[in-house]
Regions:
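Polyanion-binding surface elements
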Residues: 1-32
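Alpha-helix N-cap/helix-initiation sites
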Residues: 19, 23-26, 45, 50, ...
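Short secondary-structure capping micro-motifs at structural edges
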Residues: 46-49, 67, 94-95
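A short, conserved structural fragment
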Residues: 34-44
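Low-complexity intrinsically disordered segments
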Residues: 1-5, 87-208
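Short helix-start
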Residues: 42-62
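A short, Lys/Arg-enriched interface patch at domain edges and termini
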Residues: 55-81
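Basic amphipathic alpha-helical segments that dock to polyanions
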Residues: 30-36, 52
Length: 208
């Protein structure tokens, strides 16, 4: 998928349901992310002559979702950048499953971090789930005796992806956004090397 800045802005504004009276506030937030050098490798801003990709669009959509929960912009963009491989795997799975319209529910779980860093802390701050693993491994926790914290955010990756693609086509006038080769590449990468933090589809094969 290739977008101009105008298409990127229009798609994100529609995704976030930005009221026309608030478009100036939205653009100010986009400039704030530019100052944070997010997404990495691009210079977000009106009039910048460059091409944006599905990855840039989705990184911004995810960051805005996290910022919307009250997390500071710097913390949100740092989290998306650090764990982008995990979001990428979720979108790759969602894309392939949406094509078959079955078992397409794909979730990214963002677990609460301890206020004070500790040795051996859980690295699975961001994990990928299907409906089964979300129910069995996330929604049933934390047990009172478990060490896990109660705070978490669950992002519906399949819904986000499908909505962004639809708006990129309808509002941004991007041609065939859902057929972006990036999505197929992410899906293929996940299929070939599913990681331990990816619990969907029964999790990665256990080596013997």
């Amino acid at each position: 998928m290739e977008l101009t800045y105008k298409q990127l802005e229009a798609t994100l504004a529609a995704y976030l349901n930005v009221h026309p009276d608030k478009i100036g506030t939205f653009r100010s937030r986009m400039k704030q992310l530019q100052r944070l050098e997010f997404p990495a490798g691009v210079n977000i801003g009106r009039g910048v002559r460059m091409t944006y990709t599905a990855e840039h669009l989705l990184q911004l959509a995810v960051a805005f979702e996290i910022i919307g929960t009250g997390l500071a912009a710097k913390s949100a963009t740092d989290l998306v950048t650090k764990y982008w491989e995990r979001f990428q795997a979720a979108f790759g799975r969602a894309n392939s499953r949406l094509g078959y319209r079955e078992d397409f529910e794909t979730f990214v779980c963002l677990a609460g971090q301890p206020p004070v860093a500790r040795e051996g802390s859980n690295e699975e701050i961001v994990s990928v789930h299907d409906l089964t693993s979300l129910t069995e491994q996330v929604l049933c926790f934390p047990r009172p005796e478990a060490a896990a914290r109660a705070g978490m955010q669950i992002l519906r990756a399949d819904y986000l992806l499908e909505r962004v693609n639809r708006l990129a086509g309808d509002v941004g006038q991007v041609r065939s956004p859902k057929w972006s080769p990036e999505y197929r590449a992410w899906s293929k990468k996940r299929d070939e090397d599913q990681q331990l933090w990816d619990y969907a589809d029964g999790g990665p094969p256990v080596p013997f």
